[in-house]
């Protein structure tokens, strides 16, 4: 279930209902802090997970659940974006027929709104995966060369920096592939919607090469050209006809 990017204000009513009726709640510390005001620890069992222990906790809760009991696994943002590796494992453990996926407002959506760069005119990528990202890197290059905006989630890998693909790594990769980063406009959002700690950087891609950002960040490569309904022939012809009449 998605619980939004960080602020409880972005939590949906259906998500709140699911949390309240659950006996078991499993999630990462930052995500659980988003919903802590809704959790009742006197009647709900809260399980904090990490990359290392999540498998054993999912299995343990599944084995202890009784018929009619509910378990909620909240994700920051939207459960359908950048969380597929965990969701697919939960489907394996609990079974497709026993799992309901509840969408949430993602940091990608909020970043799109903050920057006024529409999703339907952008290439959206998540590098926040465990597997190979070379194909996604090619998509990134192609999108930039096609003059599309790109909204992306970078990849932090604290235990193995060689697998990092954070903002500075992305810029170095773009330069190696012949992209002029000095003219490329970018945004970086950290801790989106989180009270008092949200940050926004706006500048050129070349500025990012020596900068470090939090893993909870979104990067936008801004090549947006605004286009309204008046830019299309149908509306121009309609306006002309109205004037003539």
Identify what each model region corresponds to.
Residues 1-102, 110, 207, 216-220, ...:
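Class I S-adenosyl-L-methionine
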Residues 2-6, 126, 153-156, 188:
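Glycine-rich anion-binding loop/nest that anchors nucleotide
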Residues 7, 13, 77, 81-148, ...:
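Class I SAM-dependent methyltransferase SAM-binding "motif I" and its flanking Rossmann-like core
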Residues 24, 72-73, 100, 123, ...:
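A structural signal for isolated positions on well-ordered beta-strands in alpha/beta enzyme cores
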Residues 32-34, 106-110, 130-133, 158-160, ...:
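Short gly/pro/ser/thr-enriched loop/turn and capping motifs at secondary-structure boundaries
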Residues 42-45, 116-120, 204-205:
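Short, hinge-like loop/turn segments at secondary-structure boundaries
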Residues 49-51, 102-104, 127, 189-191:
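Conserved beta-strand termini and adjacent loop/short-helix elements that scaffold enzyme active sites
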Residues 69-71, 144-245:
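A contiguous loop/helix-start segment that scaffolds small-molecule binding in enzyme catalytic cores
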């Amino acid at each position: 279930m998605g619980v939004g990017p960080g602020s409880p204000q972005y939590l949906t009513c259906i998500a709140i209902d699911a949390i309240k009726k659950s006996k078991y709640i499993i999630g990462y510390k930052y995500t659980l802090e988003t919903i802590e005001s809704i959790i009742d620890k006197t009647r709900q069992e809260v399980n904090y997970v990490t990359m290392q222990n999540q498998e054993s906790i999912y299995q343990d809760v599944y084995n202890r659940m009784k018929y009619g009991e509910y378990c909620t696994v909240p994700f920051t943002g939207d459960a359908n974006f950048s969380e597929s590796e965990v969701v697919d494992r939960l489907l394996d453990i609990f079974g497709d027929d026993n799992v309901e996926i509840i969408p949430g407002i993602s940091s990608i959506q909020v970043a799109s709104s903050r920057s006024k760069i529409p999703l339907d005119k952008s290439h959206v990528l998540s590098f926040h995966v465990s597997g190979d990202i070379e194909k996604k890197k090619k998509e990134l290059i192609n999108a930039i060369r096609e003059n599309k905006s790109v909204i992306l989630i970078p990849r932090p890998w604290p235990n193995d920096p060689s697998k990092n693909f954070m903002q500075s790594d992305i810029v170095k990769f773009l330069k190696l592939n012949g992209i002029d980063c000095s003219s490329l406009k970018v945004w970086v959002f950290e801790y989106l919607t989180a009270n008092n700690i949200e940050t926004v950087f706006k500048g050129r891609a070349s500025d990012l090469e020596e900068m470090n950002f939090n893993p909870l960040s979104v990067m936008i490569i801004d090549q947006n050209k605004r286009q309204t309904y008046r830019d299309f022939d149908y509306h121009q012809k309609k306006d002309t006809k109205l004037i003539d009449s």
